[in-house]
């Protein structure tokens, strides 16, 4: 999980979602998981 000020999809499988007001990227590749904060 990377925590970044700006989250962007890295590959085609990355999805940008909102969970409890947090913007997150979820992906099949665990290295692509990101969280805003």
UniProtKB/Swiss-Prot annotation:
<dbReference type="GO" id="GO:1990904">
    <property type="term" value="C:ribonucleoprotein complex"/>
</dbReference>
<comment type="similarity">
    <text>Belongs to the bacterial ribosomal protein bL36 family.</text>
</comment>
<dbReference type="GO" id="GO:0005737">
    <property type="term" value="C:cytoplasm"/>
</dbReference>
<dbReference type="InterPro" id="IPR035977">
    <property type="entry name" value="Ribosomal_bL36_sp"/>
</dbReference>
<protein>
    <recommendedName>
        <fullName>Large ribosomal subunit protein bL36</fullName>
    </recommendedName>
</protein>
<dbReference type="GO" id="GO:0003735">
    <property type="term" value="F:structural constituent of ribosome"/>
</dbReference>
<keyword id="KW-0687">Ribonucleoprotein</keyword>
<dbReference type="Pfam" id="PF00444">
    <property type="entry name" value="Ribosomal_L36"/>
</dbReference>
<dbReference type="GO" id="GO:0006412">
    <property type="term" value="P:translation"/>
</dbReference>
<dbReference type="InterPro" id="IPR000473">
    <property type="entry name" value="Ribosomal_bL36"/>
</dbReference>
<dbReference type="GO" id="GO:0005840">
    <property type="term" value="C:ribosome"/>
</dbReference>
<keyword id="KW-0689">Ribosomal protein</keyword>
């Amino acid at each position: 999980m990377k925590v970044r000020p700006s989250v962007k999809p890295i590959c085609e499988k990355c999805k940008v979602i909102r969970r409890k007001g947090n913007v997150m990227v979820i992906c099949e590749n665990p290295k692509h998981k990101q969280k805003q904060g």
